[in-house]
Amino acid sequence: MKSLFNEKEARAFVGKYGSLPEALSLRLYTSRLIGKNSNLVLHGGGNTSVKLKTKNILGEDQEIVYVKGSGIDLATIEPEGLVGMDLSPLRRLRTLQAISDEDMDNQLKIRKTNALSPDPSVEALLHAFLPPRYVDHSHADSILVLTHLKDGEVHLREALGPRVGILPYIHSGLPLAKAVAEIYERIGAVEAIVVLYHGIFTFGDDVRTSYERMIEYVSRAESYIKKRCAGKSPVIHRKKIKPLKDHRSSASRMVNVIRGTCAFPAADGSLQRWYTVVRDGTEMKDISRSEEAEGMCGSGVLTPDHTIRTKNRAVYLREVSEDDEELRKKVSQSVNQFKTAYDHTFSEQVKKKRIAREKLDPYPRVFLAAGIGLVTVGMTREAARVAADIAEHTLMAKLRAKGVGEYLPISDSDVFDMEYWSLQQKKLGKTVPPLLQGQVAVITGGGGAIGLGIAEQLLAHGAAVVLCDIDAARLKKVHSILSTKYGDSNLEQATFDVTDFKSLDQAFAEISRRLGGIDLLVPNAGIAHVARIEDLAPEKFDQVMAVNLKGTFNVIKASVPVFRRQGTGGNIVVISSKNVFDPGAAFGAYSASKAAAHQLSKVAALELAELGVRVNMVNPDAIFGDAEVSSRLWELVGPERMKSRGLDPEGLREYYRQRNLLKARVLAEHVGNAVVFFASDQTPTTGATLPVDGGVPAAFPR
């Protein structure tokens, strides 16, 4: 590992944050250097601090310690992420023999110099007790590898040298802070302190020294491990492992089943669904097929901090069956075994510790599947990604540890204390989840005005959305509009032709592989052609039928195996048309195709109810879109209708507004609201038609 400290960059940081004290700007700079190195910290892990002398509001001298806020990501930390606290009263806490979690939390909060700052890191007292101006802390993989080895302290001393203090694992808070301060004072010229199963602390009176000591000692650990592993085969594959016929298809099927097996009723009665992440690179696939795979899954986290993201252990799937029923049986069996073990550990720990705790959900977050690789689940896509990053680093670290010596896991007691520590749980937050969080929504015709309106409402309510269209340019434009407003984390896109079942089926498999499955399908792709029957070319009729009828058939058909494997129900909301009940002259192909698709959707409602899948239809009318994204249908029919009525574009919009009973201008977002209603399962409804047209009497469902 090399130092990335650059004087020019450091000066640029000082200039960028010119209103801050220089020491604080430099603290931000090296904090980001640490945060951007995933071999040092992952997703909010690690922490840094700096001590400054300043004036308080009364003009009195005051020493402040700025510590990274709890859960703040070092990679992107801003000034607000460093929490300033009055140092003197914090240091006096060192005289205490013990302090409750609640009292420590309160002491940290009342010492903040800005009441609106986030909560400081749980390591804040440790940073306060250490005398050096700068303190850096990381969960470096290579350091943790050595701490997990039998005779770990011996390995650490040989690897790191004499100027490093080594402590056994101590729970974060006052006990660890006092122990670190004591060993710092006891050892002369100490440059770093390692806490077993926890990580490494480095320090210095200037920012570069503290940072580069971190890099230096982590580099020593890496070199030591590399030397010990030289010439050894990292992975020994299991014998007689059945090869997969189609890796990507197997991965898609498997995540559907995992996702469904792990779904459970939430406190509000809704179904808690999951997103998945698949890591199937060469290294993860090799480990999944190895003799050590099952043992790695059972040997726990690298550091107790990780347990709130990944649980302590992972599930190992020795085989991914080509038969869906057999696959579901094996996954269900493995998940139930995990839950039973989790429940047993929880009961055992609360009994031994004589405490009362509310049990968290017992579902696994990490799976290792033979031949597939790593799969993680999360209640948000970000949570699934975080779990995947941590699990991937954990598996690689355990593989390296194998080459050095015997790997020793952390005790269940220590992991339990961290998982059920109230101050650690705060990192996860307690906010009420959005209405559709956990759902994957697939929208065809995603490049048009209605597709945009539907996607926007689904994203606003927390769903992950996959925009699908045959027109890549229009799809890209809609994606850009939505990502600007909502970001990319819950937004995906796929390009395919709904009339081509094979490519569509492959696209749905890829959507499953990327997100876990499908909960909401919105068949919205459609085309139109204006011609009286006498003038309507048969091939044009066939073309409209192919997209509007066969396309609807294809997407519904392709979704059924996904819904079946998940076993958690779902919704199909077909974007139909006012023309189903109120057709127009010279619009025969469109009206007939929409009416046929509408009838097909009713049949789907009859057939899919046994899977818990509801099928409903939305009948919009006169959705024009806007200047950014127009309606393709109105691009086609609008000119002829303006001409026949002597209207300009705005006049045509007004004509259709005045035509409906409510005199309402119907927008794409109104269609989106209807889709959200059906997707949220607020009523036990299937086979229904919901007009979104302002009230057109001739189009009343009947």
Describe each region flagged by the PLM.
Residues 1-441, 453:
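Glycine-rich flexible loops
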Residues 532-533, 540-542, 656:
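Substrate-binding pocket helix/loop in short-chain dehydrogenase/reductase
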Residues 556, 593, 601:
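Active-site helix of classical SDR
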Residues 561, 606-607:
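Alpha-helical segment proximal to the catalytic Tyr-Lys
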Residues 577:
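Residue(s) in the substrate-gating loop at a strand-loop-helix junction
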Residues 664-692, 697:
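C-terminal substrate-recognition "lid" of short-chain dehydrogenase/reductases
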Residues 522, 609, 614, 685-687:
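Short, small/polar-rich loop/turn modules that mediate ligand/substrate recognition or access, typified
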